[in-house]
């Protein structure tokens, strides 16, 4: 179960790295990022950060264009996001999955880590 405890140093480092990458690729970063780490699962929830152009598209019922564009950008920055998580945690990332909720201006980055060696 994901915790709602205050962010740990690794969670904060990952949040900051993911926010920086989103700002670099999108031109505007999220207003809030929360990262939860639980075993092999790392979940980053990003709130806010839609550009004025994206807001306009959403307001004119073209949110699907925003979602497709965001997903493309998330795929483009995927290797760098994986590198950031691996660097902070010292563990390989097995998988990265991204999703967007345009209506609520939310994005999520889900990383699945390789199991720890015993």
Please provide the spans of the model-predicted regions.
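Interaction-mediating elements
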Residues: 1-118
